[in-house]
Amino acid sequence: MKDAKNTFQNIHYNRQKPSFCLKVALGVGEFFYKKVINLKNFLYEINFLKEQKTDSYVICVGNLTTGGVGKTPIVIDLANELAKKENIAIISRGYKSKLSKKEAHIIKDFKELKFKNGSLCGDEPYQLAKKVKNNVVVITCPNRKKAIDLARIKFGIKTVVLDDGFSNRKVKKDKTILVIDSKMRFGNEHLLPFGPLREPISEIKRADEIILVNKGDENIDEARLWVEKFDKPFKIATFEPKSIYNLQSKAQVVNPKKQKAVAFCAIGQPSQFFDFAKRYYALPETVSFDDHHGYTKKDIKELVKVAKRNKTNIFITTQKDEAKLKCLVDDVSGYSFNVMELGVRIEEQ
């Protein structure tokens, strides 16, 4: 399964050419997917399908592609900035959450985080809840309207941020922000399953603003010129490592001095994290799991084997992964599981 996912991702981003038979199969799949997506958007445009209005001001932060573009840190930054003036709610669908999909769930209220780790509520909602200000509520529900209504009725919140909602047109948005990876962009520019696009590129017309994410891209000036062709206001978000801390003790790791470590993660674009990790550690081996992978004790045992093979007792992973690891590594003696925190700086253009 993992090999198949890697194959698709390589095809999506022009790192591998599909065989003739696979190309035909993917092309047929894309043809029917495109028909469905175009029909959906057409029905919304002629008001046959109607976007549900809410009593809240709704800001959507989304993307056109599958995989990680760096949306979560941007949602955190936006919510914390808005929270300087009023109470805010972040609404997430709760992808890979084990909670009931029929109800809206409060992951964090004004007082506390309701879950000890992300294994139950989902890694991204947990990460959001840990990093936002006290007056930011985090709620999950596939039914965004239900979650928005809960935020207003229970907490009196008037402004909500939808974490990933560009393709979901059931709720009317007051502002739509589209996040694009400056390096990966739209890959081969094909729709699923042939490419990474969930929506046609032409649907950028629905965005009010674009945030171009720079994760150490040397060609950011060229990317800036590329995004200008969409004729939308845009900003550039630059990601940089902010700190490294030990997951077990929470102590800061100061100047790792290129110690040997095993880097691992379960995110959409693992290579970008590994590039950051190489600035601080010598990485004899890296391990990538499927995006949103739920870690098990067996996974930890396998990681320890990798570390032993490479004669190190240090691991480095992401904050997104931290949410699912805490309950698994506390009793792993003799090994340090370190977490890299990324900071984001957003600049007007």
Model-predicted segments: where are they?
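C-terminal accessory "lid"/substrate-recognition subdomains
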Residues: 1-16, 185-311
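Residue-level signal for inorganic ion chemistry
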Residues: 32, 72, 128, 163, ...
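Walker A (P-loop) phosphate-binding motif
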Residues: 41-112
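Phosphate/Mg2+-binding loops and adjacent switch elements
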Residues: 95-229
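Short, flexible loop segments at boundaries between secondary-structure elements
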Residues: 290-293, 333-349
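Acidic beta-strand-to-loop metal/phosphate-binding motif
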Residues: 313-320
